[in-house]
Amino acid sequence: MTTRGSRSEKVKRIFQQFDGNLDGGLSREEMSALVVAVNPRVKFSDEQISAILDEVFRTYAEFIDGDKGLTFDGLLRTYDDGAGDVDRDFDALGIEFNEETKGASEASSSSITDERAVEAQKQQRTAAWAVSPNHGIVFDETWKLVDDLEILVKRLKSKQEKDGKLKVDNNNVDAFSEAGWSRELGPSSDISDKRIYWEESSHDYGVFVKELGVLRSKADGARSREEAFDGHMAIGKVLYEHQLFKEALVSFKRACELQPTDVRPHFKAGNCLYVLGKYKESKDEFLLALEAAESGGNQWAYLLPQIYVNLGISLEGEGMVLSACEYYREAAILCPTHYRALKLLGSALFGVGEYRAAVKALEEAIYLKPDYADAHCDLASSLHAMGEDERAIEVFQRAIDLKPGHVDALYNLGGLYMDLGRFQRASEMYTRVLAVWPNHWRAQLNKAVSLLGAGETEEAKRALKEALKMTNRVELHDAVSHLKQLQKKKKVKKGNSANEEGPFIVVESSKFKTVGEKTTLRPDLAIALQVRAFQRVTRLWKCDVEALRREMRDNNVPVSYSGNGIPTKSIRRPNLEEILRRLLNVLKPETFQGAIKAINEKILSVLDDSGSGRVDLGMFYAVIAPLCGGHPDKRKRVAFDALLWKPVNEGSSQITKMEAVKYIKLLRAIYIPSQGMSEMLEVHGESDDTSTVTFNQFLEMYDDSEWGFGIMSTVFKLETRDRNRHGNQVCSVCRYPIIGSRFKEVKTGFSLCNQCYSEGKIPPTFKQQEEYKFREYASEVEAMKAKCVCFSMQSHKKTIAT
């Protein structure tokens, strides 16, 4: 563990090494030398150096001493604000502590010898935070508590190590992206790369907690409230350093009770709660820290960037990415050199589909910290999402060069190679992922798929078997079944190599005919599948449509006025995200993040076409109502009620015709963009229509298959069927087991899955037919009934003939 005062001493040694003229300041030339020296692997241009120095000298202007330049306190502050990593820079410079240096430092001010001796002893006993001028120990009695606690922790660790109860997660530190959050206020050392898991159910741990309670009682018995606060904060920090997070939280909570308006205990409690996976409670503590910092004037102003960053990260832990973006932006505005804030902002923007903005933020982070592997990884992912694949490959490779075992970079680069059809290279990337993370089942599955794409069927089969050992997910069994079907097909081809053709041909839509009224038309199914895919990604079907009605009834939204003076209940995107979190509270954070990304890209981008960042809440409710859970008729009713809830219609039982037309065209623009976007252009050009529409008239407009949103009847059919399996039936084109509806060609008997039918794919064997007649079966039971009816009719006909 880092010793007391060592962090400040490291900064001092760095400062002394580059203060060439010993004038107590770092000039631009000296700062330039420092930046270059601590980034030995980076080749800076003169423009980059100049920009970095301009930013530093502007941000820390209060620490600039005339021509001398940046003072020692200024350099220390840059590290405190997260603009650099002290330990990394110290190691990069190859500086070592030695007895001569320590002796010289002590001799430089030999007065008050006894106090210096006492301080030197203190510095040998615990961590750097304790001697920080802003966040360290204030009272002498607190030192005694800290020393006693260190003995207790050491004893507990020794006993648990001896009994083999102490677990240390010794994962490859290169494998994962950095958390990027500020663990401390002011000078600190980060938690060890090795996560420690204490055995809390052991007898030794119980004894430790009991003895810890005695120390807490001593802190409570201090002579003043300030001293008690100092004691509990120090106890909490020591426990936090040793990764005893639950016990540390108790101490920080007690400190919060003693001084509710102090930023530090709330911040520390938030950190503990985040590590313990209690993201909502963590967010609440950071909000209290933010409130205290903002009301405390300039006293805590320099801590605001750290609070904003950690608040953003705790929100991401809940899946609230849009809200997190707001706080990362605030941190970056307050501290423009905070490269972690910029990186986190870029990553969050990527997470909600704002790729161009993500690229800009990530490039700024890399500009400030060129060896930031995580920023390179997310920048490459953003570039790939924008279609700049070759540049993305270069940036992914740069991330891997900086961190050879970077799992995210290796895995995502493998996915990029798969998209480009470079299967052999993809397989190599997934192999490297598995070398770092052997039980990464997705990498193992993707390796099998890439090997299959590369034509190495036997290797693919072995890789799939390995994946099955890691997990028993149904998609793996489908993949194995698919592989077997392909092998069967391959054997048939070998016996008839002269007529070997591609796996399918695409037939024009007019050649696909339907048998029976219940069989879905091919174009309708293609659109419905897209809507259903969006519905599944967003999990809106898990939100009962009645929950939308309750939101409208129970939560008041203030009325605002748009540019043309029309009253509206508009809301900012982050606030809308909070509402969606309530509606989709059953989703895990990572699933909710995916839902927000899809909603932001598909719905909010259309509703907020002006880029104001605000959305008409009533229209939003009406747009998502058709995809929520519940009976289709109820969904339509709630959509109509959402339009009634808008200020222009409130209090009435009817909506304006123009509002109804706008709604229908918005639905088509969002969910059927190939047909609907051109119609939206007409909406903005229409004159005001004061006529009104009843609910029944609204239903007629809604259900119109050509100009309305009648496609929802097909979507509802998919909702009820898309988990149906058809026994051993496989699609004649893709060879995957058929799930959902089965489309059987009545003349030749081949069957297609939903996807292949919607895309017009047929086996090349049947390409000579003039037309193809399909009957749709919801299940094999339905198919068997149809077959029995057919046999019965044939038998009956024969009897009559006789």
Swiss-Prot record:
Residues 6-41, 595-630 form the EF-hand domain. One of its GO terms (cellular component) is endoplasmic reticulum. Gene3D superfamilies: EF-hand, Tetratricopeptide repeat domain. GO terms for molecular function: calcium ion binding. It holds the Pfam family TPR_16. TPR repeats lie at residues 229-262, 264-296, 305-338, 339-372, 373-406, 407-440, 442-474. The keyword Disulfide bond does not apply. Keywords: Calcium, Repeat, TPR repeat. This is Uncharacterized TPR repeat-containing protein At2g32450. It comes from Arabidopsis thaliana.
